[in-house]
Swiss-Prot record:
Annotated region (Disordered), positions in chain: 64-86
Compositionally biased intervals (Low complexity): 70-79
UniProt-listed Pfam families: YidD
UniProt key word Protein transport: no
Function: Could be involved in insertion of integral membrane proteins into the membrane.
SMART domains membership: Haemolytic
Family, as annotated: Belongs to the UPF0161 family.
Name this protein carries in UniProt: Putative membrane protein insertion efficiency factor
Localization terms from the record: Cell inner membrane
Organism: Janthinobacterium sp. (strain Marseille) (Minibacterium massiliensis)
GO cellular component, one term: plasma membrane
Keywords, ordered alphabetically: Cell inner membrane, Cell membrane, Membrane
Membrane topology (UniProt): Peripheral membrane protein
Amino acid sequence: MKTILQLLVRAYQLGISPFLGQNCRFYPSCSSYAIEALEEHGALKGSFLATKRLCKCHPWHAGGVDPVPKKSSSKTSTTACGCGHS
C-alpha cells in the first residue's frame, strides 16, 4: 500500500506539478514530504502526516522548514542516564 501511495505522489510530481509551478510554502515541498512520511512511517501514519501538512499549505500560513518527524523508538528508557538498564 505504501508503494502505491508513493507512486501516486510521484505521478503528481511528474505529471501535474510542473504545470502548477513551485508554489509550496514549505521545505521540503508537500509532495516530497508525503513521500518521505510514507517511507518513514508507513501508509497509515504517513498518509495522516501528509494530509496534515497539506492542510497547513495555504496563503495564511507562514510556511518554512517542516521536516518529517522521525519514527520514535518503541523502547523508551525510564532511567536517568537513558541507558535502559534496570
